[in-house]
Regions:
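N-terminal secretion-targeting helices of virulence/extracellular proteins
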Residues: 1-96
Length: 96
């Protein structure tokens, strides 16, 4: 039975989204390590440090939101694949 849904394409998209999410997480981790190194070495003083930390918090919150959206899209695609396969199998069993 052919529903017209390309599970391979959906699965590929899901895998690509997961890869993007992993890449985003890696960038966030690397950025965080850089910031921690800067703070520990005392390169930032007073208001400059406060400004930098505020800007970094904005960056990381946007980054977290993007990461969460990408991972939720991947999960939604996986759920869609599972549901359609279940429906397709059920219809096929009823036809046989």
């Amino acid at each position: 039975m052919q529903s017209g849904i390309s599970y391979d394409k959906l699965n590929y998209i899901s895998q690509q989204l997961k890869k993007i999410a992993n890449d985003l997480q890696y960038i966030a981790d690397q950025t965080s390590e850089i910031v921690n190194g800067i703070e520990k070495n005392g390169f930032w003083i007073g208001k400059s440090a406060d400004y930098f930390q505020a800007q970094f918090k904005k960056f990381t919150s946007c980054f977290d939101e993007t990461y969460n959206q990408v991972t939720s899209y991947a999960l939604a695609i996986e759920n869609t694949i599972t549901k359609y396969k279940t429906i397709e199998e059920s219809v096929f069993r009823k036809m046989v």
